Amino acid sequence: MLKKHDLLNLDWTKTNGMIPVIIQDYSSSEVLMHGYMNQDALTKTQEDGLVTFYSRTKNCLWTKGEISGNYLKVIEISTDCDNDTLLILVAAQGKTCHLGNSSCFISNKYNINFLFKLEEIIEERKNKFSDNSYTSSLYKSGTSRIAQKVGEEAIETILAAMNKDQIELINEASDLIYHLVVLLHDQDLNFNLVIDNLKKRREKNLNTNSEKLLK
């Protein structure tokens, strides 16, 4: 988190007393939006824990979500190497874009961010039971049934691969990942923790290889 005294170290001169701010989802790493802050906006952001921008058209502060309720809860604030741009990691409380999208940056590419959106739906089905939801029925049946489904889908994925059936492999892999995410949330975990663990393993492997090169 950026400390309050660090305000003095930021370069406010390049854009007439303002600093560009990039807002990024802390969980999915999706870039949500871009805005500007002056010193008052940054101070308010740090004090309230909610992202507040400076409107260049209205010449006033505005807290994201003050009308829609879709606030951006601050997780971490960092600066770039030139101290003239901020990156704020947030937990978005609803849709960030006024068009109803999670991000103001529209992309037609499907990526891992979709997996995190799927997680949101799965978590909602876990907490709010629906008679018409297959996911809710899994949680109602309990951990044993969910774990069994993961095992079944894993076997079917293996069989599809052994049969060289690419279309079936994609279908079965999709089922496997879905049920695995359901199981993770059943244990109050999420896929982001898995990604973090993979990153740690990768870093450990790189460090080990570097040590070998030095010997």
From Swiss-Prot:
InterPro entries (UniProt xref): His_synth_HisIE, HisE, PRib-ATP_PPHydrolase-like, PRib_AMP_CycHydrolase_dom, PRib_AMP_CycHydrolase_sf
Pathway(s) of this molecule: Amino-acid biosynthesis; L-histidine biosynthesis; L-histidine from 5-phospho-alpha-D-ribose 1-diphosphate: step 2/9; Amino-acid biosynthesis; L-histidine biosynthesis; L-histidine from 5-phospho-alpha-D-ribose 1-diphosphate: step 3/9
Recorded GO CC terms: cytoplasm
Example of a GO MF term: phosphoribosyl-ATP diphosphatase activity
EC top class, as a word: hydrolase
Catalytic activity, as annotated: 1-(5-phospho-beta-D-ribosyl)-ATP + H2O = 1-(5-phospho-beta-D-ribosyl)-5'-AMP + diphosphate + H(+); 1-(5-phospho-beta-D-ribosyl)-5'-AMP + H2O = 1-(5-phospho-beta-D-ribosyl)-5-[(5-phospho-beta-D-ribosylamino)methylideneamino]imidazole-4-carboxamide
Keywords for this protein: Amino-acid biosynthesis, ATP-binding, Cytoplasm, Histidine biosynthesis, Hydrolase, Multifunctional enzyme, Nucleotide-binding
Assigned protein family: In the N-terminal section; belongs to the PRA-CH family. In the C-terminal section; belongs to the PRA-PH family.
Protein name stated in the entry: Histidine biosynthesis bifunctional protein HisIE
Annotated organism of origin: Buchnera aphidicola subsp. Acyrthosiphon pisum (strain APS)
